[in-house]
Regions:
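C-terminal substrate/ligand-recognition segments
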Residues: 105, 408-529
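An aromatic- and glycine-enriched ligand-binding surface/loop that stacks and positions planar moieties
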Residues: 24-89, 175, 200, 239-243, ...
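Acidic, serine/threonine/proline-rich low-complexity intrinsically disordered regions
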Residues: 181-182, 193-196, 247, 260-288, ...
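Bacterial N-terminal signal peptides that target proteins for export
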Residues: 2-10
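Short coil/turn linking the two alpha-helices of tandem helical-hairpin repeats
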Residues: 169-170, 176, 218, 255-264, ...
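Conserved, well-structured interaction surfaces
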Residues: 44, 49-53, 57-62, 84-172, ...
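C-terminal motif of bacterial Sec signal peptides marking the signal peptidase cleavage site
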Residues: 20-22
Length: 598
């Protein structure tokens, strides 16, 4: 087959990535005054449990694939190419033209709506109304209400306040800190915008308080993917736990130590989007936070990189690497998720996993979605090229065995995570009538009948109606059931153990002197991730991470490892910003791969 490296000129350069525009007071415009119902709510434990449950709504909004034209932040981060009528915000982000007039307000509204609701709960808690339920409530649901349950409620409230505030800080920098106040329609509101440092400290303090109450109430650990419903009174799967609070704290402090904000900026005299100076101690603070998580986990074995189990029932399933299964629902073996967003698997739910499959699965494999015409989110060549060879060396490295001579050969012997993340020409996907078959994305001389390994290009090939525009389809998170009428439940994983190891690797590496060898600790964390990814061990179990690698090269390796391991998980956009590498990796058009069959 003849190859052609194609350019997609309509994906505009993203080197101008900026913070979201300034704020509004929409969150204060409350149409209903709920104060009249407080006495009834806080005398009934079932209603209070419902209040706490409600705090979890929209926890995954910034991660959602429904955001910005069905591609979320993956589009401006150059991970996916979007197609649809709702691309304006994604284009503003990609072009660096976000301003007060065109900025989206979901981060602002979601944060302050939840913050206000949590403050109402906290105020009632602090006034003793929640504790009074212990002796007066005749409607205790499920099991007996205890002091530990009430403290569990409070721990969750602290965690979710930190969660929404941390997301807000990523978008805006310093924010107005309303703390525990609850404003009404008649209140005069004059809360100044706090500095970046003050905002980070407040979020970190919320994490510390969350850990205190969650540990104290017996919820230091909660498996992330066992029970999609969860329960305030019973099982706590899918809810906040102490370890999730530690993980969130580590993430917040990683961002706070990064070059975007850990620096002196002449354009930020009020320190709204930076600290105003560089301090290496911020890297140490972030390292200490993530190390606390790792040490606690090492002592208790709560979390691990999902080792995975091969499913050899079909050729397609046996072809998938372990990495693919880290994102599928597995109530027994998946100990990797730390915090998840649980979505319905009902067919009519527009935010569910079925809709996710409809947006990203190839036409030949989505018969039940044939009339939706929603296909979008096509991986870019830039993302595909980031995946190294199976020996761990980059495809442009002289030590690798990368070939660019045939449409299928260029994907052979690559990092196994590639085929778990992206479907390319020659990739296995399950197919209705044949159980499994190769997927074809080529153009040119089409095979229309016969061998199913060759005929899918009629529907899936580049330039076909409603088909890929880059030559690739997304595979990560997608249930590959060949269009069968099944709706398998899958969580959206918001934090997982691999991210913890990547934070530890990055912070440890930044603590050594410039020009020095990368610390052994950083190398070991990356090797752990690559071992699970089924990268070849190579000489002395190095997994492509050599002993003599310097700090600066290790930094680039970690950046690429995050790009690969965390693809489509709402990290790349923020990573590119915090590392200040947008000019290097995002400027210029995106690319795809055109394969012509002759």
């Amino acid at each position: 087959m003849r190859l052609k490296y194609i350019t997609k000129f309509f994906l505009v350069a993203a080197c101008g990535l900026v913070t979201f525009a300034a704020c509004s007071d929409e969150y204060l415009d409350k149409k209903v005054d709920v104060s009249e119902t407080q006495e009834k709510v806080y005398s009934d434990s079932a209603k209070v449990a419902g209040v706490v449950n409600g705090f979890y709504g929209q926890i995954g909004y910034s991660h959602s694939y429904k955001r910005f034209g069905q591609c979320g932040l993956d589009f401006p981060a150059k991970e996916l190419e979007a197609r649809g009528a709702e691309l304006s915000m994604g284009m503003y982000l990609a072009q660096g033209t976000v301003n007060v007039n065109n900025a989206g307000n979901d981060a602002w509204n979601n944060t302050y709506n939840k913050w206000r609701a949590i403050n109402i709960f906290m105020n009632n808690y602090n006034e003793g109304k929640v504790a009074a339920i212990l002796s007066s409530d005749p409607n205790k649901p499920g099991e007996t209400l205890t002091k530990a349950t009430i403290e569990y409620w409070k721990g969750q409230a602290f965690f979710l306040r930190a969660w929404f505030i941390a997301t807000m800080i990523k978008h805006y920098g310093g924010i107005p800190l309303i703390e525990d106040r609850v404003y009404t329609e008649n209140d005069k509101i004059d809360v100044p915008r706090s500095t970046y440092g003050e905002s980070v400290k407040y979020a970190v303090d919320q994490c510390d308080s969350a850990f205190y109450y969650l540990e104290r109430s017996g919820h230091i650990y909660s498996q992330g993917t066992v029970n999609p419903v969860g329960s305030i009174h019973g099982k706590s799967e899918g809810r906040a736990c102490g370890m999730a609070a530690l993980a969130l704290k580590a993430r917040i402090l990683l961002y706070a130590a990064s070059p975007l904000v850990n620096c002196k900026r002449e354009d930020d005299p009020n320190l709204l989007v930076s600290y105003g100076d560089y301090d290496a101690a911020r890297w140490k603070t972030a390292y200490d936070a993530v190390k606390r998580f790792i040490d606690l986990n090492n002592a208790n074995s709560w979390y691990e990189l999902r080792p995975g189990q091969k499913d050899n029932t079909t050729a397609a399933k046996s072809w998938w690497p372990r990495f693919y299964y880290a994102f599928m629902h597995d109530a027994v073996t998946n100990k990797e998720p730390i915090f998840c967003d649980f979505l319905s698997n009902e067919q009519g739910d527009s935010q569910n996993r079925v809709a996710l499959d409809a947006y990203y699965s190839p036409n030949s494999r989505i018969s039940r979605f044939a009339n939706l015409n929603k296909l979008t989110g096509f991986p870019t060549q830039e993302l595909v090229d980031a995946f190294p060879m199976a020996d761990g060396f980059p495809i442009r490295d002289s030590r690798s065995k990368y070939t660019y001579e045939d449409g299928d050969d260029m994907y052979l012997n690559r990092d196994p995570r590639l085929k778990a993340t992206v479907s390319y020409n020659g990739a296995y996907r399950m197919m209705n009538a044949y159980k499994d078959a190769l997927m074809r994305t080529y153009t040119g001389d089409m095979v229309t009948t016969g061998n199913p390994d060759e005929t899918s290009a009629i529907k899936d090939g580049i330039y076909q109606p409603n088909a890929t525009t880059t030559g690739y389809y997304r595979m990560k998170f997608i249930l590959d059931n060949g269009g069968l009428e099944t709706y398998d439940y899958r969580p959206t994983i918001l934090m997982r153990y691999a991210e913890i190891l990547l934070i530890a690797a990055e912070t440890a590496n930044e603590l050594v002197a410039d020009g020095a060898l990368a610390p052994e600790e950083s190398k070991e964390y990356i090797r752990m991730i690559r071992q699970r990814a089924e990268i070849e061990e190579g000489e002395s179990n190095k997994y492509g991470v050599m002993d003599d690698i310097k700090k600066e090269d290790m930094r680039k390796l970690i950046q690429t490892e995050r790009q690969i391991e965390l693809a489509f998980e709402e990290h790349r956009y923020w990573d590119v910003r915090r590392w200040k590498i947008a000019k290097e990796v995002l400027c210029g058009p995106s690319h795809g791969m055109e394969i012509t069959r002759r």
